From Swiss-Prot:
Native source organism of the sequence: Lysobacter enzymogenes
Disulfide bond residue pairs: none
Cited InterPro entries: P-loop_NTPase
Protein function: Involved in defense against bacteriophages. When this probable 4 gene operon (bGSDM-FE772_23060-FE772_23065-FE772_23070) is inserted into E.coli it provides nearly 100-fold protection against phages T5 and T6 and about 8-fold against phage T4. The operon without bGSDM no longer protects against phage. Probably a nucleotide hydrolase, possibly of ATP.
GO BP of this protein: defense response to virus
Keywords annotated in UniProt: Antiviral defense, ATP-binding, Hydrolase, Nucleotide-binding
Binding site for ATP: 217-224
Protein name per its UniProtKB record: Probable ATPase FE772_23070
């Protein structure tokens, strides 16, 4: 915050108090004084500016000095009156322009308050020659030292860097947290027995690479405390067991992006494993760069009602390329990190509150299993122990599907699965012990509370707080409730706020969470017409958030609904995007606590009466069942529908809340839950889902922007699994599959399987696309994939297909202008006929498709100048710059001489380095190079500058290689095709050394076949590989894919080839 005028006036009035000697001798004016004040602030934290201004300045000069810096500082009038803190940008500028002597002089000047300034202390350490001893520094100074490392940048002089400092801070925070959580002895015989079992699980000898234990209990059951005791015990052993805790409640953790899990793994192991700590300073920046690239490519997790970004066509190629390279890049970074010679003994990994992510999608469970496989195959882990802390019992037929799905997948990989362990409530004696540990010394009060309050450890701790910390009147109210064997209202409210409401991230939605639980399932309409008005009526004064009109009310209800839908701890995902069911156990406990509050009874009656009216006005079977439920609970007359089966289905989770006579009528068990409002993915399977639910699950829901399981699988490079899932139960007529199936076919190189009939798709859907004013993203994606499949499979387009693209190129806006040109350019070069409209062509010349567009000889007029990015021009060969000098226009070489020399130097430096560095370099290359197409001397010059990469073939060619190796063992045919390319890679990363490559291939064939294809493309060697495959491969599929690539390359190179040939410079 900028200093106020009164602060400046105060500074002027008291300026004479300052007696600081000047840094440099001589009388200084206001400008010099401001400069000196800025320097002194740059090496300090919060400081009084008056203490830092020389006493020789006049009041007018002081006022001018303070005014000159007013915009560069932060203030906190309430908490730090008359103190300033130099802003980050101003601080970095000031530190950068000063030499070390000036900074030391500014830091050595002593003024009041300096002894307590952690920033000044840290800056003195940073500027000193002596290496700091981190363990000897206070936590506040250590944190400031981490900031100083960032502020000084390349001028940081010590071997101990930001990563070591951050690791020390994290270790201290963890130690403090463990001390807090384990301060009192563990209470509860079952809890102690479970701890003993988990310690034995984590330390016992085993021959199994992966062992799994599942611990479950409701909110507040003590799982976090149990895990803290476990981690403390393992860390204090003579041979400590390192623990990696993956907390799915952390926003940075995305289980579908392996890199986020790997970052957490390295960060935590660096604190306890010296060998990992030594490598962390290199690994973590590389992993974070990889994470940033994946995020920019749209590979972040999408919520249940949020379309996954990379399903939009404009980011598909980027996302596809980045996702394909992720496993090999991260394998390159973390290679053998967890091998027995690095980490001796077992490693314990904890998945905390697994339901937070498992409930989102079956795809998440598969991603987590894949990550554990990666740790074994690439990181070299040979003894992993996994503890999964969950909420729901895996054997519960209604709630346990998510946990059971993960455990089943783990078992299929050969993991040893321990018997799941449940944490029960504490019995009254144990509850009394917990209350005594919390400070409730009165045995009568402890006994009364233990008898009245459920044995949930968190609720008991909250009760202890109420008994100890409240006013006398509150304490007496609590005691009175306990004597009456009731839960006291204060503890009930606090638990609900801390364990239920707090889980909902959106603050706008939180006031309505508890009222919504009176219905077992909510819709946006129910929230709008029932829940939100009931809560707002219960407030004494209308809040500012109450909508003023129908449109605002609908928008608010939708926001609350989305917040509930994304709170997986509290609700279950449903295939019907318009409904959200609550978790049965959590809802039942919440209602029990709400009943203990006086306001709960009033709110319940209001909500239930309004909900009954809401459902009676509707005619569906679900509404009739829910109206019956609310009327029965209120004690009002009700009529039981004749169709008892539908009522049993909807009310299955709430049958215990009904009056005895109605409960008896509905008591017959339901063999399976039909698709109703309370039915979610967690209780569904291929066999028992309705056709509509299965289609929503597989394809998603465009109206609610919910991504389908199939699209998520293909996006994550699991095309085979997605295709098999669809073929097990198709959702559309033969020949007309959803888009993700077409993409899966294209990726797998299975182009003639009779699954997608492109002519039938065009006949059925093209007229509808062309009739629209603009083509939406989903239609555009479909057009893209049928075009790509047609060009790869057949090398041509039918007349209706070409006409569709011609019309689309004339009307496309937004993403279409950047998505289709790369494919249309291929189609034009193959057919010799113009397709792309001038408007799209002009736009394409500003995108990554510019090179292909210019290679097409059909369009006569060439622009005077276009700008190409260096990442698209550069070829990873040691003679690339030499060929550029020989073939590229002389003016281009002169204008970019220094950059080309630097770029070749950086390419040469990749030799023998991890392959991850190749992609990291190219991901950062975004320098524009101006090209004059009319000056290109012939076809060789054009191909060198414009050909670029062919990411459309990375996955199909990967499949072509996989067909030539079994269980990671390359066949002689594969070696015959691949080995010559190693010799022609004049810059060869470590993993492209033949012996290393084949060893890595045996551990992870998918990842390293992909890595080979991508790197060969960067070296312009794919044509040679495909020539060999097309001629000699014994797999028809491999020959077909290779021939298709050669046809593309020949068309784009106007009858020639883009193959680099034998480099002029080779390296051994």
């Amino acid at each position: 915050m900028t200093p106020t005028v009164p602060e400046l006036e105060f500074a002027q009035a008291t300026a004479f108090e300052s007696n600081v000697p000047p840094l440099f001798p001589g009388r200084a004016g206001p400008d010099d004084g401001a400069d000196r004040l800025r320097l002194r602030l740059a090496v300090r934290g919060w400081a009084r500016p008056l203490d830092l201004i020389a006493a020789s300045n006049s009041p007018d000069d002081v006022m001018a000095i303070l005014g000159a810096l007013a915009a560069e500082v932060e203030t906190a009038v309430q908490t730090r009156p008359n103190q300033w803190y130099l802003s980050l940008a101003a601080r970095k500028r000031e530190l950068a322009r000063r030499d070390d002597a000036q900074l030391r002089a500014a830091a050595s000047a002593s003024v009041p308050g300096d002894d307590d300034d952690p920033v000044l202390h840290a800056m003195r350490i940073a500027l000193a020659d002596a290496e700091p001893t981190l363990s000897a520094l206070g936590t506040d100074v250590l944190a400031a030292l981490g900031n100083a490392c960032d502020w000084l940048g390349e001028r940081w002089r010590h071997a101990v860097g930001a990563q070591r400092i951050a690791g020390e801070l994290a270790s201290r925070a963890l130690d403090a947290d463990l001390r807090r959580m384990t301060r009192d002895p563990m209470v509860g015989r079952s809890h102690r027995d479970t701890l003993a079992r988990l310690i034995g699980f984590a330390t016992a000898a085993t021959q199994t690479p992966l062992s799994v234990a599942y611990v479950y209990g409701g909110g507040g059951a003590g799982k976090t405390t149990l895990l803290s005791f476990l981690q403390r015990d393992l860390s204090q052993r003579a041979e400590p067991v390192p623990v990696v805790r993956i907390d799915f409640d952390e926003p940075a953790i995305d289980p579908t992006r392996m890199v986020t899990l790997n970052i957490a793994l390295v960060e935590q192991l660096a604190r306890s494993v010296p060998a990992v700590c030594d490598r962390a300073s290199d690994m973590l920046p590389a992993l974070r760069d990889t994470a940033l690239v994946q995020h920019d490519a749209g590979l972040s997790r999408g919520g249940p009602r949020k379309r996954i970004k990379s399903s939009r066509p404009e980011s598909m190629l980027k996302a596809e390329s980045v996702a394909s390279q992720a496993a090999s890049d991260e394998g390159s970074i973390l290679y053998r990190l967890l091998a027995p010679d690095v980490v001796a003994g077992p490693i314990l990994i904890v998945f905390d509150t697994a339901e937070l992510v498992l409930a989102q999608s079956d795809h998440v469970a598969s991603s987590l299993v894949s990550w554990l496989g990666f740790l074994h195959n690439e990181a070299g882990a040979r003894d992993l122990r996994l503890v999964i802390a969950g909420r729901d019992p895996p054997d519960d037929p209604d709630l346990g599907h998510a946990a059971n799905s993960l455990l089943s997948r783990l078992k299929d990989t050969g993991a040893r699965i321990e018997t799941p362990i449940g944490l029960p409530e504490l019995d009254p004696a144990e509850a009394q012990q917990l209350l005594r540990n919390c400070g409730v010394d009165d045995p009568t009060a402890a006994a009364e509370a233990a008898a009245a309050v459920p044995g949930n450890p968190l609720l008991l701790r909250i009760t202890a707080d109420a008994l100890l910390q409240g006013e006398a009147e509150l304490r007496e109210s609590v005691r009175r409730a306990h004597r009456d064997s009731r839960i006291d209202a204060d503890s009930a409210r606090n638990y609900l706020l801390r364990r239920v409401v707090a889980h909902v991230r959106d603050p706008i939605a939180r006031p309505y969470v508890l009222a919504a639980t009176y219905s077992p399932v909510v819709t946006a309409k129910l929230l709008e017409e029932v829940v939100i008005p009931a809560v707002d009526r219960s407030e004494r004064e209308p809040g500012p958030g109450i909508p003023a009109n129908k449109k605002a009310a609908t928008a608010k209800a939708k926001r609350v609904f989305d917040a509930l839908a994304s709170t997986y701890w509290l609700t279950r995902q449903t295939l019907r995007s318009e409904t959200v069911p609550f978790n049965r156990e959590i809802r039942a406990f919440a209602l029990k606590l709400l009943a203990a509050t006086p306001e709960g009874a009033l709110l319940e009656r209001d909500v239930r009466q309004s909900a009954a009216i809401h459902h009676l006005r509707r005619r569906s079977a679900d509404d009739r069942a829910l109206a019956l439920y609310h009327l029965a609970v209120l004690g009002h007359p009700y009529t039981v529908p004749r169709d008892l089966a539908s009522v049993q289905t909807v009310l299955r989770d709430v049958i215990e809340e009904l009056p005895a006579d109605l409960r008896n009528r509905l008591a017959p068990p339901v063999g399976s839950v039909a698709p109703g409002v309370a039915r979610g993915v967690a209780r569904s399977s291929i066999d028992d889902m309705s056709d509509s639910d299965w289609q929503r699950y597989l394809e998603g829901d465009e109206r609610s922007k919910r991504a389908g399981e199939g699209a998520q699988m293909v996006k994550a490079d699991r095309a085979r699994e997605a295709l098999d899932l669809y073929l097990a139960r198709p959702t559309r007529p033969p020949g007309l599959p959803p888009t993700f199936v077409i993409q899966a076919q294209a990726d797998l190189g299975e182009w003639d399987e009779g699954i997608a009939d492109i002519d039938a798709i065009l006949e059925r859907e093209a007229d509808d696309w062309l009739a629209r004013k603009s083509i939406g993203p989903e239609a555009l994606s479909r057009i893209y994939w049928i075009t790509r499949l047609a060009l790869q499979a057949y090398g041509r387009l039918s007349t209706p297909h070409a006409m569709l693209l011609r019309n689309a190129s004339e009307t496309a806006t937004g993403p279409g202008l950047s998505t289709l040109p790369a494919l249309i350019a291929v189609a034009e070069t193959m057919s010799g006929e113009p397709i792309m409209a001038g408007r799209m062509r002009s736009q394409a010349l500003k995108t990554d498709a510019a090179g292909r567009t210019l290679l097409c000889p059909i369009h006569g007029h060439l622009p005077e100048t276009i700008e190409l990015f260096d990442a698209g021009i550069a070829v990873v060969q040691s003679d690339w710059r030499q060929r550029m000098i020989q073939l590229a226009p002389a003016r281009l070489i002169r204008a970019n001489e220094a950059h080309l020399r630097d770029l070749q130097s950086r390419l040469d430096a990749l030799h023998a380095k991890p392959i991850a560095q190749v992609n990291q370099l190219f991901n950062k290359m975004r320098t524009g190079i101006a090209v004059e197409p009319t000056t290109m001397a012939g076809l060789n010059s054009a191909v060198l500058l414009l050909r670029g990469l062919t990411p459309e073939f990375y996955r199909p060619l990967r499949e072509a290689l996989l067909a030539l190796c079994e269980n990671g063992v390359a066949s002689p045919m594969m070696r015959h095709a691949v080995d010559p390319l190693f010799e022609r890679m004049s810059i060869r990363p470590a993993e492209m050394e033949p012996a290393t490559f084949y060893r890595r291939l045996s551990n992870n064939p998918n990842a390293w076949c992909t890595a080979f294809i991508v790197y060969a493309d960067r070296c312009r060697l794919l044509p040679g590989l495909c020539e060999s495959l097309a001629r000699y491969a014994d797999s028809p599929k491999s020959r077909r894919i290779a021939s298709s690539f050669l046809a593309w390359d020949k068309a784009l190179c106007r009858g020639t080839s883009s193959d680099w040939g034998q480099p002029a410079k080779t390296r051994k």
